[in-house]
């Protein structure tokens, strides 16, 4: 694994190099006002990229769910395989089904952005169905995620994976800054991080009172949004009760093998994808004195997940474009990304480090944020790792 090293150049708006051993150095995202506007970026994108086709979007749902069903049918034949192939078959199924259902999760996420079709009610019905099946409170998360898009990169108002300044880092964090502590932290984050965020707002924006995606009166939501939280909760209760009935008929072990472990993999990938999109030593964060929407939207990182880019419907390698134009359907996002890259220039960031290496590297290098020493840019924060 390559080692990261920063080279800093003085002056406002400077571009520091972040060197990764064996790779071309990545430049820090400039923190000055971009020399282009959102309107100019939109004009560079072919108009058809903004068109949402109901038929095309549904074709991806059918495609993913068809393969999910095929994978499930395959499990009914595992008992016919000789040892040890029957034991090997289950982990293969878990990985394949987990990756595929992550793609389903992404489509539901797209529904929440009104990027699935021209019809809001269709998007919400499809999104509610798909997300509830994956135990996600659709409307509850849609609302908080919308706020994330409105406040990306803001240390004061962003909703998730908000880094802390060194002075606010937990006292025990320095004792986890070693390979064993890092491995344990990642294991916990990837396995229970997502449900802990939904239930208790762990790693989310701090609020003055209890914040939970299941609580209609949580401070995350306004009065006019509370009914939607109830709808999400009822949908989740219905799915949970259905799973309980399945467990009584087929057994808990069967349910965990067919549904539980793939869902665990979905949750792990979701945390990985989100974390790596917004955590990188080349990305700035801003306090209220420096933040604006466009600078925050550009403080995101496109990543390369290999063949999984396609399985995950390119949420991984077109995330910059997604933050700029979130109602654009995923099947046009790559074309749009290629169209705006020449305009974005050094404001566009792409890291092709394999995601599993990047996850470990970022967990080691990106522990807290601080402004650069000796500069006037006190509202621009960069990742550090030295206690």
Curated annotation (Swiss-Prot):
Statement: the UniProt record of this protein carries the keyword Cytoplasm: no
Gene Ontology CC: one annotated term: endoplasmic reticulum membrane
Motif (Histidine box-1): 109-113
Motif (Histidine box-3): 319-323
Topology versus the membrane: Multi-pass membrane protein
Pfam families reported in the protein's UniProt record: FA_desaturase (PF00487)
Database matches in InterPro entries: FA_desaturase_dom, Fatty_acid_desaturase
Motif Histidine box-2 per record, residues: 145-149
Family classification: Belongs to the fatty acid desaturase type 1 family.
Role, per record: ER (microsomal) omega-6 fatty acid desaturase introduces the second double bond in the biosynthesis of 18:3 fatty acids, important constituents of plant membranes. It is thought to use cytochrome b5 as an electron donor and to act on fatty acids esterified to phosphatidylcholine and, possibly, other phospholipids.
Entry protein name: Omega-6 fatty acid desaturase, endoplasmic reticulum isozyme 1
Organism: Glycine max (Soybean)
């Amino acid at each position: 694994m390559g080692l990261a090293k920063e080279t800093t150049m003085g002056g406002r708006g400077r571009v520091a190099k972040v060197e990764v051993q064996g790779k071309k150095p990545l430049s820090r995202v400039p923190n000055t006002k971009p020399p282009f506007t959102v309107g100019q970026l939109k004009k560079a994108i072919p108009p058809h990229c903004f068109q949402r086709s109901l038929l095309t979007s549904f074709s991806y749902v059918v495609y993913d769910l068809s393969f999910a069903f095929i994978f499930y049918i395959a499990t009914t034949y595992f008992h016919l395989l000789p040892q040890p192939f029957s034991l090997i078959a289950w982990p293969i199924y878990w990985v394949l089904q987990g990756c595929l259902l992550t793609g389903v999760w992404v489509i539901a996420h797209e529904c929440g952005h009104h990027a699935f079709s021209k019809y809001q009610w269709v998007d919400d019905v499809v999104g509610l169905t798909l997300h509830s099946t994956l135990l996600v409170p659709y409307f509850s998360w849609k609302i908080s995620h919308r706020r994330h898009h409105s406040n990306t990169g803001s240390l004061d108002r962003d909703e998730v994976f908000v880094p802390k300044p060194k002075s606010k880092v937990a006292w025990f964090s320095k004792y986890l800054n070693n390979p064993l502590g890092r491995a344990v932290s990642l294991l916990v984050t990837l396995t229970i991080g997502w449900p802990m965020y939904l239930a208790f707002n762990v790693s989310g924006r701090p609020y003055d009172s209890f914040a939970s995606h299941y609580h209609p009166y949580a401070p995350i939501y306004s009065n006019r949004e509370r009914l939607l939280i109830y709808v999400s909760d009822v949908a989740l209760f219905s799915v949970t009760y259905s799973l309980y009935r399945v467990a009584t008929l087929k057994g808990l072990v069967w349910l965990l093998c067919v549904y539980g472990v793939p869902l665990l993999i979905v949750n792990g990938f979701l945390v990985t994808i989100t974390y790596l999109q917004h955590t990188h030593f080349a990305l700035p964060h801003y306090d209220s004195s420096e933040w604006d929407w466009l600078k925050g939207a550009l403080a995101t990182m496109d990543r390369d997940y290999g063949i999984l880019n396609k399985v995950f419907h390119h949420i991984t390698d077109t995330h910059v474009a997604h933050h700029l134009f979130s109602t654009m359907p995923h099947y046009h996002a790559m074309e749009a990304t290629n169209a705006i890259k020449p305009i974005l220039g050094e404001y566009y960031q792409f890291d092709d480090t394999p995601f599993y290496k990047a996850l470990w590297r970022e967990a080691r290098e990106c522990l807290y944020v601080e402004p650069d020493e000796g500069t006037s840019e006190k509202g621009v924060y960069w990742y550090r790792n030295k206690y």
